């Protein structure tokens, strides 16, 4: 983020990038680096050209389906209705320790975590995979013959199972924390599973770290992520993902009023 390429380094990268033998992930690395180099030099046209080429090359290497993401968003809205939360109100693990920071990448979640964890009662951890792992298990279970798909199968869980899921989360995350009363889980994609979170951890705090769509989406477009976040490699896909995100967060506000705190980055 802070490294500035020298003119000589830029020339070398340009030479390598023009070599027809360079392809695939190496081509991605070079073009994102050149995009950063020319952005630092305020040559924004050339910077965008390299970012765009790097992103399109990366997009061809990954298997991302924006229509499937929209479908999953609609399924969450349809399945996680008011009746689900009334049926299982306060039935999971009662711990109030977890603070979930959700949203999109590049929306300020790290800064928010740093601010919160500066308090003596709050501990920062990392982007914990536990909720995504659990939702994946439920999704695989739903694909078996005769089972309802996730998230519709949440309606078929019982109190014992919900509590066990909450207990498992608290136990499995112990390795990432000490005895501090509250800890932060800042996996941004957890916003897709707030319904599941509130069923198994009804007293958990949830914060939506939100940033202006132009700033958030373009920042994601310029970022080559170490893994995941495949929606960021196309401006069209980023826009659709942001729209799905806002639509789903609006739904959580309707069915779980007062349970999600919105923090706007620009404020």
Predicted features, each with a name:
Residues 1-177:
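Alpha-helical solenoid repeat scaffolds of the TPR/TPR-like class and their adjacent stem/linker regions
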Residues 125, 130-158, 176-267:
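PAPS-dependent sulfotransferase catalytic domain
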């Amino acid at each position: 983020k802070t490294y500035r390429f020298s003119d000589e380094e830029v020339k070398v990268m340009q030479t390598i990038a023009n070599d027809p033998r360079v392809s695939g992930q190496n081509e991605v690395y070079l073009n994102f680096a050149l995009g950063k180099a020319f952005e630092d030099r305020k040559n924004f046209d050339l910077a965008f050209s390299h970012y765009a080429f790097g992103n399109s090359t990366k997009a061809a290497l990954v298997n991302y389906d924006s229509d499937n993401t929209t479908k999953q968003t609609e399924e969450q809205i349809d399945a996680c209705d008011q009746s689900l939360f009334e049926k299982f109100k306060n039935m999971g693990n009662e711990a109030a320790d977890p603070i979930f920071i959700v949203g999109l990448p590049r929306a300020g979640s790290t800064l928010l975590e740093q601010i919160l964890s500066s308090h003596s009662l709050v501990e920062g951890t990392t982007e914990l995979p536990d909720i995504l792992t659990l939702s994946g298990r439920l999704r695989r279970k739903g694909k078996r013959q005769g089972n309802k798909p996730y998230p519709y199968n949440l309606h078929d869980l019982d109190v014992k199972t919900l509590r066990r899921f909450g207990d498992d989360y608290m136990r499995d995350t112990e390795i990432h924390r000490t005895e501090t009363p509250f800890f932060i889980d800042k996996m941004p994609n957890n916003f897709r599973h707030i319904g599941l979170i509130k069923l198994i951890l009804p007293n958990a705090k949830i914060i939506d770290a939100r940033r202006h769509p132009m700033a958030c989406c373009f920042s994601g477009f310029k970022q080559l992520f170490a893994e995941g976040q495949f929606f960021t490699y196309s401006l069209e896909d980023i826009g659709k993902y942001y729209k799905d995100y806002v639509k789903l967060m609006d739904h959580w506000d309707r069915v779980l009023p007062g349970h999600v705190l919105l923090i706007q980055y620009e404020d």
